[in-house]
Amino acid sequence: MAAAFGRCCRVLRSISRFHWRSQHTKADRQREPGLGFSFEFTEQQKEFQATARKFAREEIIPVAAEYDKTGEYPVPLIRRAWELGLMNPHIPQNCGGLGLGTFDACLISEELAYGCTGVQTAIEGNSLGQMPIIIAGNEQQKKKYLGRMTEEPLMCAYCVTEPGAGSDVAGIKTKAEKKGDEYIINGQKMWITNGGKASWYFLLARSDPDPKAPANKAFTGFIVEADTPGIQIGRKELNMGQRCSDTRGIVFEDVKVLKENVLIGDGAGFKIAMGAFDKTRPTVSSGAVGLAQRALDEATKYALERKTFGKLLIEHQAISFMLAEMAMKVELARMSYQRAAWEVDSGRRNTYYASIAKAFAGDIANQLATDAVQIFGGNGFNTEYPVEKLMRDAKIYQIYEGTSQIQRLIIAREHIGKYKS
């Protein structure tokens, strides 16, 4: 019975993927480059959005609080998202994937995050892990590591952050020593999303022992199988928010990696790692917008039901003005990630817009979650109501994939550079 059900799910998923892939190809042929923004989604985009929205509201929201309480990894939801074609949207068509653009992936991400950003991060942690291979892998690497992720719901992880090197990626200490046709990896990584669930990792390590070597030549990117001898996976971290997401430290001790698992070549790793951020930060930003929209909706619903001083909360100008400010902010944050995603899909370097979207949406998610708690009053401080979880979940958006302060450094650098030129 179970085997038959599994075969049925695979057939249905294949049909769904074929339909969406066909529609995506048709839409691409019809799209004329250079026309600028369109505020009307394509039929395919509407379909993706509707599917993700239905999944979030009917399957994620009812169990989100329990996953937050237990910290259990949401395997059933991950499998279901995979079956629906909502997982791994960036995998190219020639590897069996949908080959969606960043804009389309962002629409899915926003809807999933509306349901629960912990679940959304668990589902979409793959996007960051996959991106270095998508942008820099050879055909053999892509088919081997991306192709198998379209055959079953496997996970991967992006192993860059270390205990002493977070925003300062150039400061990582993990070393890769070349010996013949293989590399010996030694070092420690920290705060790795999907670290204990991944089947393989993208790993950034220092391959040039010269401490004065520039970052764009000192680091190499590797694909490392998670079951390679010498890898020690740490305990699941107990985080403030997004608790069902799997976050761990990983130790690499004399881990052997074949040269065929090097991306591009020696010294190309830093550029690859940073290039991945340009493509994934819009998606992360869309997750922050999904949380912000949820905060606005919950606050509005509560204000329409709760009475104080003899009338509904929403009838008090102080509250209605708060909701107006929240609505303004969420719409502007949405526009920021859509602009950044559009830049990616147009084939342009989007570092500037990606950082604006990441910083702004992360800040807005925190502001709206805080405002929602305020509107709920004492109830907002209690776990029986949804907004306290939103407030805890929101904070990480100002930290992971580059802190809000780092984004501002990038924005300033890009802005000043454009001004001088």
Curated annotation (Swiss-Prot):
Cofactor(s) required for function per UniProt: FAD
GO molecular function (one): acyl-CoA dehydrogenase activity
Assigned keywords, A-Z: Acetylation, FAD, Fatty acid metabolism, Flavoprotein, Lipid metabolism, Mitochondrion, Oxidoreductase, Phosphoprotein, Transit peptide
Cited InterPro entries: Acyl-CoA_dehydrogenase (IPR050741), Acyl-CoA_DH_CS (IPR006089), Acyl-CoA_Oxase/DH_mid-dom (IPR006091), Acyl-CoA_Oxase/DH_mid-dom_sf (IPR046373), AcylCo_DH-like_C (IPR036250), AcylCo_DH/oxidase_C (IPR009075), AcylCoA_DH/ox_N (IPR013786), AcylCoA_DH/ox_N_sf (IPR037069)
GO cellular component: mitochondrial matrix
Binding site for octanoyl-CoA: 167, 278, 281, 349, 351, 401
EC number: 1.3.8.7
Pathway(s) annotated for this protein in UniProt: Lipid metabolism; mitochondrial fatty acid beta-oxidation
Origin: domain of life: Eukaryota
N6-acetyllysine modifications at: 69, 212, 217, 259, 271, 279, 301
One biological process term in Gene Ontology: medium-chain fatty acid catabolic process
The reaction(s) this protein catalyses: a medium-chain 2,3-saturated fatty acyl-CoA + oxidized [electron-transfer flavoprotein] + H(+) = a medium-chain (2E)-enoyl-CoA + reduced [electron-transfer flavoprotein]; pentanoyl-CoA + oxidized [electron-transfer flavoprotein] + H(+) = (2E)-pentenoyl-CoA + reduced [electron-transfer flavoprotein]; hexanoyl-CoA + oxidized [electron-transfer flavoprotein] + H(+) = (2E)-hexenoyl-CoA + reduced [electron-transfer flavoprotein]; octanoyl-CoA + oxidized [electron-transfer flavoprotein] + H(+) = (2E)-octenoyl-CoA + reduced [electron-transfer flavoprotein]
Residues at the active site: 401 (proton acceptor)
Function: Medium-chain specific acyl-CoA dehydrogenase is one of the acyl-CoA dehydrogenases that catalyze the first step of mitochondrial fatty acid beta-oxidation, an aerobic process breaking down fatty acids into acetyl-CoA and allowing the production of energy from fats.
PANTHER family: MEDIUM-CHAIN SPECIFIC ACYL-COA DEHYDROGENASE, MITOCHONDRIAL, MEDIUM-CHAIN SPECIFIC ACYL-COA DEHYDROGENASE, MITOCHONDRIAL-RELATED
Complexes and interactors: Homotetramer. Interacts with the heterodimeric electron transfer flavoprotein ETF.
Name recorded for this polypeptide: Medium-chain specific acyl-CoA dehydrogenase, mitochondrial
Gene: ACADM
